[in-house]
């Protein structure tokens, strides 16, 4: 992700399913992203659900080799190694499982001419991970890609394709994360939202609260991505988040339904 995005949050009601030996299966939440640092768009939700006992994972499609927004390290293998460590730091700050890194080329997910097999391989690889994890809920970018980044849009499309196809292990409860106009301005004060990038407010029928502790975990997670954001930018963005969100963040279901405050119901 080239721009840090807004956090999304929820409360949790456990719904236990019996399994062998009298044990219960914990709920599983998977967030699917293009880049390490995209997870900052839902940082508080990941922290909260992990704290409440949900098995929380993030899947990152690209190697991040082209993301050098806040570092002198050249693009390529060196920056990719740093971003792996940043993703691990972020996951630890949020209290979730270590990141699942698929390693596809950063900035090139939609480059069909360079590699006609890439999109198919990405779809198959992501489906394999989801079949292994069997999440109850998925979170990913909306069709706008949050910041409009092409890799974000590709990930949204692949996840939506798997849901619509009823792929094994892929749930029907899928929520889109987006960035409000205020968020785009906070990330880059000189930039306004591109035309038609911000979804209509009426689509955000999932509105979920988050605690100060969840927000602080998300701030620490964001601060892990030092190749992407300066300390000053982290503070500016988190202040804007706090002012704009006011303790809850809206999400858009892939298929809009009744207004709710619980991803699992």
Show which residues each predicted segment covers.
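Active-site rim/loop-helix segments in enzyme catalytic domains that contact anionic ligands
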Residues: 20-133, 161-168
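Metal-dependent de-N-acetylase/amidase catalytic core
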Residues: 2, 6, 16, 20-29, ...
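A broad, structure-centric signal for solvent-exposed, well-ordered loop/edge residues
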Residues: 7-8, 68, 109, 217
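Hydrophobic membrane-insertion alpha-helices, especially the h-region
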Residues: 9-13
């Amino acid at each position: 992700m080239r721009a840090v995005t807004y956090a999304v949050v929820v409360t949790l009601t456990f719904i236990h399913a019996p399994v062998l030996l009298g044990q219960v299966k914990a709920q599983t939440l998977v967030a699917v992203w293009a880049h390490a640092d995209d997870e900052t768009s839902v940082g508080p939700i990941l922290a909260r659900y992990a704290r409440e006992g949900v098995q929380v994972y993030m899947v990152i499609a690209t190697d991040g080799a082209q993301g050098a927004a806040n570092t002198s390290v050249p693009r390529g293998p060196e920056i990719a190694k740093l971003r792996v460590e940043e993703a691990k730091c972020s996951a630890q700050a949020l209290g979730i499982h270590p990141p699942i890194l698929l390693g596809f080329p950063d900035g090139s997910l939609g480059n069909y001419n360079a590699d006609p097999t890439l999109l198919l391989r990405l779809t198959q690889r992501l489906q394999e991970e989801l079949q292994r994890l069997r999440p109850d809920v998925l979170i990913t970018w909306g069709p706008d890609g949050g910041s409009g980044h092409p890799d974000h849009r590709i990930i949204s499309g692949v996840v939506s394709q798997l849901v619509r196809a009823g792929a094994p292990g892929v749930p029907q409860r899928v929520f889109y994360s987006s960035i409000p106009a205020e968020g785009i301005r906070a990330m880059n004060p000189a930039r306004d939202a591109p035309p038609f990038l911000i979804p209509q407010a009426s689509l955000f029928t999932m509105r979920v609260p988050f605690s100060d502790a969840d927000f602080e975990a998300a701030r620490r997670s964001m601060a892990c991505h030092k190749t992407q954001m300066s300390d000053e930018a982290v503070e500016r963005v988190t202040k804007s988040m706090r002012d704009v969100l006011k303790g809850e963040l809206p999400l858009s279901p892939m298929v809009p339904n009744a207004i709710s405050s619980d991803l699992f119901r």
